[in-house]
Amino acid sequence: MAGTVRTACLVVAMLLSLDFPGQAQPPPPPPDATCHQVRSFFQRLQPGLKWVPETPVPGSDLQVCLPKGPTCCSRKMEEKYQLTARLNMEQLLQSASKELKFLIIQNAAVFQEAFEIVVRHAKNYTNAMFKNNYPSLTPQAFEFVGEFFTDVSLYILGSDINVDDMVNELFDSLFPVIYTQLMNPGLPDSALDINECLRGARRDLKVFGNFPKLIMTQVSKSLQVTRIFLQALNLGIEVINTTDHLKFSKDCGRMLTRMWYCSYCQGLMMVKPCGGYCNVVMQGCMAGVVEIDKYWREYILSLEELVNGMYRIYDMENVLLGLFSTIHDSIQYVQKNAGKLTTTIGKLCAHSQQRQYRSAYYPEDLFIDKKVLKVARVEHEETLSSRRRELIQKLKSFISFYSALPGYICSHSPVAENDTLCWNGQELVERYSQKAARNGMKNQFNLHELKMKGPEPVVSQIIDKLKHINQLLRTMSVPKGRVLDKNLDEEGFESGDCGDDEDECIGGSGDGMMKVKNQLRFLAELAYDLDVDDAPGSNQQATPKDNEISTFHNLGNVHSPLKLLTSMAISVVCFFFLVH
């Protein structure tokens, strides 16, 4: 009986010693002789097992995962791996750009709506000015003002409208109404058919003085900069979308497959690609994309220059919210010269003025309904200009986005960072050698040739668009100090109008006019301040490779500490029986 027990214990001890190898033994198991693990892995990618051999095969038909011996991969499996590798790459690119893309999309929407709010406020201010001071000019004035600000909105959105024509049309339309309703109320009906003559006389006689030219200058400069700013943001979105959905070359697809999936064919499920090998592959695959980096950097810096100059007459918020004051001054100018104008226009338009000029009552101090023109007094951080500066600071943190993409992809995919016991695209190696890996790849892929092919056509197109917008941004950017230049002061501003805080700049030049701060509250009217986690597509799914590695990592941890302790206990009991 004792002999039987001793024999049984010896057998159990031998089996346990085989089941629990020492720590010094290499962790990777030998290739699966039955391809069972490979079949389990592949079924996660492709339901059904008809493409997976039950036992290793020669693999003579393989084109990417070239075997050095029997393999558990077929040609169909290889094709599926290539497709999956490309999808993994696209997903990693989208994950890399998620925060940047949402930042630009969010701000493009915020600023577009904010500009529309500014236009709407400016129209309301101007209508209120007419209603409270020139009621006889409404509703005609309301119609002309509405058309003008509609054109302003369309121009900001990119419509092919000439700003000078917009301003001329406004004053051409206003003057006949001012002449017949304000300067000559009670004009006979027979004399009301001179509108075309009055429109022409308005320009010939400069009846509004230099105010139309002043408005042209202010509105043109501010709207041009605003439009370029929005165009630049929209192009930024287009650039990110383009690189998010790049179709990589066949050579790149093969390289990715060798790196991520060819190890499966040898049954090496737990082995990760070498970090250095990943860098080599990504530099080859993304050589064309990285060429965007130079123009992307210039894009952000040029946009910063533009934003730094967007104040005073280059700030549409400042200009449009003060426009009602300038229009009022222009009408006041007409009234001051009404006598001379009436005589001259009477001769020019062949209209004999039988009655003495009678001007409508006009109060000395402009009264504006403060309830209509009320603008919330807000903190500096909530203004348009501060929001623009905040955007630029965030964009500058992404200035190296494209040059850093290869490193990002490798750091966010399963790789062996220390380059030990890792997959080099052909076999499991104790330590990765870049030179050896490059030499081993020459028979399959020429990395130098891949880089020299240049960027894909779609990347070349986006680079051309970046060059164009960068040129526009440089053209529209205001050199530092130019806003306080003497030439601009002559256009209707005094150098003392603005302090260090450009958000305090105001428009208008009339004495006694109510000054309207160009500060609009964002938080009350715009609700775009979302967390990045709320962005569409922010919940990125793990790549198939990640899921597989995680699953099989758990499967590989069968030798738990509890089982190890159990084996030790059994060994002690057996030793006791053997001794006794």
UniProtKB/Swiss-Prot annotation:
Chief subcellular location: membrane
Processing after translation: O-glycosylated; contains heparan sulfate and/or chondroitin sulfate. Cleaved intracellularly by a furin-like convertase to generate 2 subunits, alpha and beta, which remain associated through disulfide bonds and are associated with the cell surface via the GPI-anchor. This processing is essential for its role in inhibition of hedgehog signaling. A second proteolytic event may result in cleavage of the protein on the cell surface, separating it from the GPI-anchor and leading to its shedding from the cell surface.
Proregion residues excised on maturation: 555-580
Source organism (scientific name): Pan troglodytes (Chimpanzee)
Residues carrying sugar: N124, N241, N418, S495, S509
Keywords, alphabetical: Cell membrane, Disulfide bond, Glycoprotein, GPI-anchor, Heparan sulfate, Lipoprotein, Membrane, Phosphoprotein, Protease inhibitor, Proteoglycan, Pyrrolidone carboxylic acid, Signal
InterPro entries cross-referenced by the UniProt entry: Glypican, Glypican_CS
CC terms in the record's Gene Ontology section: cell surface; lysosomal lumen; plasma membrane; side of membrane
A GO BP entry: regulation of protein localization to membrane
Family: Belongs to the glypican family.
Paired cysteines (S-S): C35-C72, C65-C262, C73-C265, C197-C349, C252-C285, C274-C422, C278-C410
Positions of post-translational Pyrrolidone carboxylic acid modification: Q25
Localization (cell): Cell membrane
Protein's UniProt keywords contain Phosphoprotein: yes
Pfam families named in the record: Glypican
GO MF term (any one): peptidyl-dipeptidase inhibitor activity
Primary role: Cell surface proteoglycan. Negatively regulates the hedgehog signaling pathway when attached via the GPI-anchor to the cell surface by competing with the hedgehog receptor PTC1 for binding to hedgehog proteins. Binding to the hedgehog protein SHH triggers internalization of the complex by endocytosis and its subsequent lysosomal degradation. Positively regulates the canonical Wnt signaling pathway by binding to the Wnt receptor Frizzled and stimulating the binding of the Frizzled receptor to Wnt ligands. Positively regulates the non-canonical Wnt signaling pathway.
Lipid-anchored residues (GPI-anchor amidated asparagine): N554
Subunit details: Heterodimer; disulfide-linked. Cleavage by a furin-like convertase results in production of alpha and beta chains which form a disulfide-linked heterodimer. Interacts with DPP4. Interacts with FGF2. Interacts with WNT5A. Also interacts with WNT3A and WNT7B. Interacts with hedgehog protein SHH; the heparan sulfate chains are not required for the interaction. Also interacts with hedgehog protein IHH. Interacts with CD81. Interacts with Wnt receptors FZD4, FZD7 and FZD8; the heparan sulfate chains are required for the interaction.
Entry-annotated residues carrying Phosphoserine: S352
Membrane topology: Lipid-anchor; GPI-anchor
Lineage top rank: taxon: Eukaryota
Protein name according to UniProt: Glypican-3
